[in-house]
């Protein structure tokens, strides 16, 4: 083990212990910050492409799973409900795994998957990577470099049902855009945020759109909300960020976003308005994307025992 890797593992371990200490002391804001910062570092290492990494692909996958667990614990702490989806005792099981990552060869104790790297971008950070441009213009020409292989989609299964509790399935049918046919490998990132823009559930990405025609990009994919409707905090909203690949700049950009508030949760079809980027999770400065009648088309199904 090189000195650089030894130092890296020590820093990660210290950060995990700090977060767990804050967590056990009830200092939840500090714990969430520590968990999210560490998750960001772990995700970057898990997705790193540099050749001088001492971590194997399998070890990187484990590092990515630890990052996912940190995100889950962070989301659990932000919930107002007493039931915690990912407990502190669970989190503490990660410390020896992270410490011994170079020799760890057992099955990971939790059924989670690494989150794609782009999920760790802070709100607005993605947009800061590019110059302002006219979004009414084309999205550029030329084939992406195996982009679909880089974005497999991260949809999660439906939660177990509980008596008296409601689960929500949202089918993303299609989105209306003036230049729909020019969007390369489009997909939608779905997240649930409180009024402060903090995640209440794990973030999910759809697979790349199934087809494009005229002014529509079709998805026809189901999103399972990762929290019972009754357990969502007051003022929460479900966000849908439409993203596409820009070959000239070689990164993924958010084109527009939409959101649905809690009073809009009801069975059946719904169309919601599209807003200009950057995504405003706090819903303070909203600007419609276009005056044209173009929307995000959804269909909701509620499941209650």
Swiss-Prot record:
Statement: the UniProt record of this protein carries the keyword Coiled coil: yes
Source organism of this protein record: Mus musculus (Mouse)
Protein name, as recorded: Axin interactor, dorsalization-associated protein
Composition-biased stretches (Acidic residues): 128-137
Function, in words: Acts as a ventralizing factor during embryogenesis. Inhibits axin-mediated JNK activation by binding axin and disrupting axin homodimerization. This in turn antagonizes a Wnt/beta-catenin-independent dorsalization pathway activated by AXIN/JNK-signaling.
Gene3D superfamilies in alphabetical order: Axin interactor, dorsalization-associated protein, N-terminal domain, C2 domain
Family from the record: Belongs to the AIDA family.
One Gene Ontology molecular-function label: protein domain specific binding
C2 Aida-type domain residues: 156-303
Subunit note: Interacts with AXIN1.
Region of interest (Disordered), residue spans: 128-150
Chain segments annotated as coiled-coil in the UniProt record: 27-62
Domain of life: Eukaryota
GO cellular component entries: cytoplasm
Keyword annotations from UniProtKB, A to Z: Coiled coil, Developmental protein
Region listing for Axin-binding, in residue ranges: 153-220
GO aspect biological process, one term: negative regulation of protein-containing complex assembly
